[in-house]
Curated annotation (Swiss-Prot):
Record lineage: Eukaryota, Viridiplantae, Streptophyta, Embryophyta, Tracheophyta
Signal peptide interval: 1-20
UniProt cross-references to InterPro entries, sorted A to Z: Glyco_hydro_17, Glyco_hydro_17_plant, Glycoside_hydrolase_SF, X8
Active site: 125 (proton donor), 272 (nucleophile)
SMART domains (alphabetical): X8
Propeptide positions: 478-505
Species this chain originates from: Arabidopsis thaliana
Name used for this protein in its record: Glucan endo-1,3-beta-glucosidase 2
SUPFAM superfamilies with a match to the protein in the record: (Trans)glycosidases
Length: 505
């Protein structure tokens, strides 16, 4: 009897320990993510950003900061997030453990695991854009990692920093590539840290920039992933490996540059890659068609899991630069790297036949009716009252305790009421006016479990999305929900064990 009780107590201890600690994320192979910049004159609300991500089935994003509003909106969505420490904060974090710990507490611990933060990007292209911060870069990375370690999150959240491929000298043939030796005092300890923590090297890969700077040496088709005949492929004379596109050659140059410093097992994560859809007069190849061609082919190439010629079959996950056109940036091409405009309309519709579902939805045919930005709240309330009264729509989902009650404000409730009325009239544009306080948008206003009429996410008016426990071999995650189901499973097992022991006794 004593041995049975001892066994039960031991099992209880092990199971409680297991349920208390999240497990490291499983390797999901190569994936496509998207960068989200905020240099827009009319930045969409975080709930609109998340609605667009959901509509396009984007499951991985990278932020250039740790915007709390967006991190809150991303909670319980299952979208995996890389957050960033801006370059102008590096000095403080690199010089002070406590500053790094406070940053992690405020921007990671406050949101995780509801928001699935997978990595912290410490600065961006620091060695080429902020040379005075180079001496503290590795210290900043280590201080952030130490703060994650103290919170038992170091196995769950990676720490790295994006490098520009301009640091790689003699990039072709790739087998001869090496990092700028003048920066080895920073790069060697950086790579040593990445290797010791099982992290990845973040690299920004832009065939467009290399193509522009090559003065015609790099063919356009080679930069765009377009098919080229075998006799036009680039051949590495040292390895006899053939390259059919610039992207693979640049990634392999990164692998070889690391190997030159005796680091051969650090994976590469491409944190930025893309092509502008407009440019200045000296950028004739910054066109809609070329941007569409490059990004469509990039997505197809990454998701085919072919890897690179040096490392075939090894995942090279990539984040497209970028989700929105950033109209406040200087220079025409800098304003036009986005896949979408601020209102959610696609700049172009990607050609992604047989390439999975990510970014494959044409949002141009999806329209919604929402409150016009800056509309008078009294007029909004009057229009809301009309829609729920004489307008004869079902407003029960925005009552207290129901699926669309939160956020509890007139704009959110008006959005639901206006859109429901609009869809009940068959998407009649005249129905989306409400005395001038409403307007039509292509951005899905659904949020959390509140799914609007016509949403690709569900298509039901204000009803909650079904949430079921993931299967034992599920490769997806849903933040707190998955932890909840896991905990329920643990306690179910404990209950069975206790009952069995009781029967034996």
């Amino acid at each position: 009897m004593a041995s049975l009780l001892h066994l039960l107590l031991l099992s209880l201890s092990l199971l409680v320990l297991a349920s208390a600690s999240p497990s490291p994320p499983a390797d999901e192979g190569s994936y496509i993510g998207v960068n989200i910049g905020t240099d827009l004159s009319d930045m969409p609300h975080p709930t609109q950003v998340v609605a667009l991500l959901k509509a396009q089935e984007i499951r991985h994003i990278r932020l250039y900061n740790a915007d709390p509003g967006l991190l809150i909106a991303l909670a319980n969505t299952g979208i995996k997030v890389i957050i960033s420490i801006p370059n102008d904060q590096l000095l403080g974090i690199g010089q002070s453990n406590s500053t790094a710990a406070n940053w992690v507490k405020r921007n990671v611990i406050a949101h995780y695991p509801a928001t699935m933060i997978t990595a912290v990007s410490v600065g961006s292209e620091v060695l080429t854009s902020l040379s005075n911060a180079a001496p503290v870069l590795v210290s900043a990375i280590k201080n952030v990692h130490a703060a994650l370690l103290s919170a038992n999150l170091d196995k769950l959240i990676k720490v790295s920093t994006p490098l520009s491929t301009s640091l790689i000298l003699d990039p072709f043939p790739p087998s001869q590539a090496f990092f700028n030796r003048s920066l080895n005092a920073v790069i060697v300890p950086l790579l040593s840290f990445l290797q010791s923590t099982n992290s990845y090297l973040m690299v920004n890969v832009y065939p467009y920039i290399d193509y522009m700077q090559s003065n015609g040496v790099i063919p356009l088709d080679y930069a765009l992933f377009k098919p080229i005949p075998p006799n036009k492929e680039a051949v590495d004379a040292n390895t006899l490996v053939r390259y059919s596109n610039a992207f693979d050659a640049m990634v392999d140059a990164t692998y070889f540059a690391m190997a030159f410093l005796n680091f051969t097992n650090i994976p590469v994560l491409v944190t930025e890659s893309g092509w502008p859809s407009k440019g200045e007069t000296n950028e004739p190849d910054a066109t809609l068609d070329n941007a569409n061609t490059y990004n469509s082919n990039l997505i197809r190439h990454v998701l085919n899991k072919t890897g690179t010629p040096k490392r075939p079959g090894i995942a090279v996950s990539t984040y497209i630069y970028e989700l929105y056109n950033e109209d406040t940036k200087a220079g025409l091409s800098e304003k036009n790297w986005g896949l979408f405009n601020a209102n959610g309309e696609p700049v172009y519709v990607l050609r992604l036949t047989n390439s999975g579902s990510v970014l494959a939805n044409d949002t141009t045919n999806q329209t919604y009716c929402t409150a016009r930005e800056g509309a008078d709240t009294k007029m909004l309330q009057a229009a809301l009252d009309w829609a729920c009264g004489p307008g004869k729509i079902d407003c029960s989902p925005i009552k207290q305790g129901e699926t669309c009650y939160e956020p509890d404000n007139v704009v959110a409730h008006a959005n639901y009421a206006f859109d429901t009325y609009y869809h009940q009239t068959g998407n009649n544009p005249d129905a989306c006016n409400f005395n001038g306080v409403a307007s039509i948008t292509t951005t899905d206003p659904s949020h959390g479990t509140c799914v609007f009429a016509g949403s690709r996410g569900n298509g039901r008016n204000g009803t909650s999305v079904n949430i079921t426990a993931p299967s034992a071999n599920s490769t997806t995650s849903s933040g707190i929900r998955s932890d909840l189901y896991y905990s329920r499973g643990i306690w179910s097992i404990l209950t069975v064990m206790i009952l069995n022991v009781a029967n034996i006794l």
